[in-house]
């Protein structure tokens, strides 16, 4: 082992550890330059460069040359406002840790990132605890990314282009100001871990049920009142965190119900009574309308609906240990009671109607995984 000042180089592990030494960019620059040509071989063999918790305000220029095989760079806990073009010279970099800095805005990442070799090499990127208000577009071109962490920023939304990251296995977006989840998030076939906690999310798109590899889903501390019934398709899900959400126990009884239009009533009659028709009998718009019918999920009903329906929360057993509030759409208010009664395996509808809302909620919430 060779020690130069307080920095430690471990020859066997090809690692330079300069953590928590309160060094500035200038000091680091001087040290790297001082190593010079006599230690060129050691620099070229370096695989890991650890610089967290110092006083760096920019990346040292020396990174732009002499580190061709560097695989891990940790610059977390500094005062970086931008990652300069020196980063693009690290052609084999696999892991970049730059959390808890001051990164944000369009100039935070180097120009040409999406066209650089990093697009093919970088697998782990941690930018949590910075000042990003939106996901930088260049990040969405890093096709080799397996782990992306952007927690604790100021993100307002998730771009639809997130689906470009087809190799992504872990996505951490907790602690932001996200209100909506784009349906395109469901197009990530390799995603195992999805963290969306501590945001302002009000609903979950049913397309998330396409994440067939998902094992852990963190949704705690949001504004969710229900989950889509399609979430039951996540058969590999092992962890589900829902604490801190206003998940409802009963649907609001006095929810305004708008009666069906005459067009919908006529279309319902055609569907329910199996009245035959051909493409030559009706205009194209009516044919398309009739084709948009949805079946009422109440097994005792057998009806259909088009634009007008009644929403109802139904608690459903999931994986044998969770009771999840899922949204159902019924064709009329008359379908509410039978369907609701069938959905409660441990508490009858009459009991639920007679109990105080708060006490029902408290007991039900104990049956939902709280994380």
UniProtKB/Swiss-Prot annotation:
Matching PROSITE patterns: LRR (PS51450)
Modified residues (Phosphoserine): 24
Annotated InterPro entries: Leu-rich_rpt (IPR001611), Leu-rich_rpt_typical-subtyp (IPR003591), LRR-SigEffector_domain (IPR050715), LRR_dom_sf (IPR032675)
Low complexity composition-biased segments: 340-351
One GO term (biological process): intracellular signal transduction
Gene3D superfamilies: Ribonuclease Inhibitor
Region (Disordered): 340-361
Record-annotated membrane-spanning stretches: none
Pfam families reported for this sequence: LRR_1 (PF00560), LRR_8 (PF13855)
Repeat (LRR) residue spans along the chain: 45-66, 69-91, 92-113, 121-143, 144-166, 167-189, 190-211, 213-234, 236-256
Keyword annotations: Leucine-rich repeat, Phosphoprotein, Repeat
Name used for this protein in its record: Leucine-rich repeat-containing protein 58
